[in-house]
Regions:
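Solvent-exposed loop and edge beta-strand segments that line ligand/cofactor-binding
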Residues: 37, 51-54, 68, 104-119, ...
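Bacterial N-terminal signal peptides
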Residues: 20-29
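Low-complexity, Ser/Thr/Pro/Gly-enriched N-terminal "stalk/linker" regions
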Residues: 34-117
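Aromatic-lined, polymer-binding surfaces characteristic
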Residues: 118, 131, 135-138, 147-169, ...
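Active-site neighborhood of glycoside hydrolase catalytic domains
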Residues: 233-259
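Alpha-helical support elements that line or immediately flank enzyme active sites
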Residues: 107-142
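N-terminal secretory signal peptides that target proteins for export/translocation
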Residues: 1-14
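Active-site acid/base region of carbohydrate-active enzymes
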Residues: 70-96, 115, 119-120, 170-234, ...
Length: 259
């Protein structure tokens, strides 16, 4: 009986975490949109004061930057605002030339790029920060990958074109995304040149560079950290997402060859 209860609690936590992820992944304007009047019904101070365990107590930042959410489930609410607290821990201002970016590790390990950014989590980060009221951070971070010396957009798997399109869906700005298009296209072509296998119609990637070091595949090779080349479903799905996003952006600029 005890094991069933533990299993049920774990399943409940998993479902709640999945709910938060889906909330940030898809459009949830109907729940949090200020324009619809929903957010005005939420007592922001009351919610934030109930989150006294948050390490970042700069409540003015939350009120100025993020959509507010209130549900009947306090665990979902706590998870949601904790996710935003994590964003505050990793937003970094690199320089006047690079602007804002996000780090993966607070201590900026040696394998990170300029100012501590790493491409591996970038797609997840973009899908969260795109919901900030002001798109300034997301747009700086997109530009960072292509216009900052020392950025490493292809050191790890990422889906930067899809991320750019995702930001555009929340904060439409054709001028910005069309200006970024040549960089996004060049980045995709860089992956093609190095990883595309024409005979298989697929991209190869190693587990380490796919953000999954020391995996079951790599442990069957001599290099247990990196592993061997493989046609990984993850990486191929990222490339498909980027190709789809590039086609959508090409349609905006009426580029029939790339659309």
């Amino acid at each position: 009986m005890t094991s069933r209860r533990v299993s049920s609690r774990r399943k409940s936590r998993t479902n709640k975490s999945l709910f938060i992820s889906l909330l940030l992944l898809f459009n949830f304007d109907s729940l949090v949109s200020e324009s619809s009047g929903t957010e005005s019904l939420i007592d922001k101070d009351k919610i934030l004061n109930s989150m006294d365990w948050l390490e970042n107590q700069d409540f003015d930042w939350y009120k100025a930057n993020v959509p507010f959410l209130e549900t009947p489930d306090k665990e979902i609410d706590a998870t949601y605002y904790y996710r935003w607290e994590l964003v505050t821990r990793h937003i970094c201002y690199g320089s006047p030339n690079s602007g804002y970016l996000l780090t993966e590790f607070a201590n900026r390990p040696f394998w990170s790029g300029a100012y501590g950014a790493i491409a591996c989590p970038s797609g997840h980060q973009f899908y969260e920060i795109r919901w900030m009221h002001n798109p300034h951070v997301a747009r700086d971070y997109l530009r960072y990958w292509f216009r900052t010396k020392g950025a490493q957009p292809r050191k790890y798997s990422s889906w930067l074109a899809d991320s750019a399109w995702a930001v555009h869906q929340v904060h439409p700005n054709e001028q910005f995304i069309l200006d970024l298009f040549p960089d996004l296209l060049k980045n995709f072509q860089g992956w093609e040149e190095r990883h595309w296998v024409k005979e298989m119609n697929m991209f190869w990637q190693t587990g380490h560079d796919d953000g999954m070091e020391f995996n079951i595949n790599s442990r069957q090779t001599k290099d247990i950290l990196r592993g061997d080349r493989a046609f990984r479903p993850t990486f191929n799905s990222y490339m498909w997402a980027d190709a789809t996003a590039l086609a959508k952006i090409a349609a905006l600029k009426k580029d029939r060859k790339l659309e």
